[in-house]
Structure formats: structure tokens, C-alpha cells
Amino acid sequence: MKYIIIGLGNYGSVLAEELSALGHEVIGVDTNERRVDVLKDKIATSFIIDATDEQSLSVLPLKDVDVVIVAIGENFGASIRVVALLKKNGVKHIYARAVDEVHKTVLEAFNLDSILTPEEEAARSLVQLLDLHVNVESFEIDEEHYVMKFKLPGSFVGYKVSDLSLEKEFNIKIIALVKGCLLYT
């Protein structure tokens, strides 16, 4: 797939690098020359422009990409303006980062494909990680595969294994369950 990422701060630059490493074509955009310089050899193309300026934005191949991601963080006004300009220019698939509830509410009015809340998602992931890693025993099969034994987290109680979406959400496959002295495979 082909992406434009506008805003190459911490979040946007990691997003650009990771998508590029997965083989996607990434075009990075930022006003900060240093941020663009850091990524120029890691992504397909980069632009040093002010995406809040409609004329500057017109140099980007907006119609030739699958998704435009607005990764601008703390500059609420810039984020909203860029999203509005993208909509005005007929960009079909827009993802935008929201840094708080008000920002998210305003972005929802644009009817975007996705509103990204990385701080919230990171906190939820950490809670799940902490919840799962209480009393974990593991055995490494190879660099990518482990067998892990852990006590059932309280949040799993009352659900069927199929309802937990462990494989889809965490790439975890249940190979056995132990209840009391009984082993279920």
C-alpha cells in the first residue's frame, strides 16, 4: 500500500519507519527539516512543507495513495486544518491522530476512516500486558514462537476462548487449558 504521513514527530516517524519496513511505500511530510532528514533514507519520499497551506499541500500526490495519515500531535489547529484541506481536496481515506477527547470529538465531525488515539491505545496495551504477565512461565521454541503458561487473567473469566479473539488481537494460539487437575487440548 501507499501512504502519506503528515507530521513526523515521535508517533509519525515510528509509523513511517515501521510501514516502510513492512514493504509499504511511505511519503513523509513535516515542516521540520531535521525530522525529514532523519527519515529520508528510510522511506520512499519526503517533503519539507507546511501542510496547513493549501498551495503547499497541492504538491503531494494525494490522489495516488491509499491512505493519508495526519499524525500531527499537540498542534490542535494544524491537525484540524490539514484534515479539512484533505477533505476539500477529495482525499478518500484519512486517518488522524487525536491527543484528547475534544480533539477526537472535532475529528469525528469529519467522518474519517479512523481516529487514532495512540496514548490511550498504549495504556490499554500496557494494562493487558501487565495483566497477562503475572506469574508467566515461558519456553522459547525459536525467535518468534514461545509456549507460555499463565494464570487466567480476571478479565477473561466468564468468556469462551473463541470470544476472546486472542489469535486476532494478540497472535496467541491456545494449545491447552488446565482446570484443576484436568488438561484440555
Where do the PLM segments sit?
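Glycine-rich Rossmann-fold phosphate-binding loop(s) that bind the pyrophosphate
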Residues: 8-9
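Aromatic pocket-lining residues of Rossmann-like dinucleotide-binding sites
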Residues: 19
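Conserved acidic E/D residue at the C-terminus of a beta-strand in Rossmann-like folds
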Residues: 30
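Short alpha-helix immediately C-terminal to the canonical SAM-binding loop
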Residues: 36-37, 104
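Phosphate-bearing ligand-interacting subdomains
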Residues: 42-126, 132, 151
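Conserved small/polar residues in nucleotide/adenosyl-binding loops
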Residues: 184-185
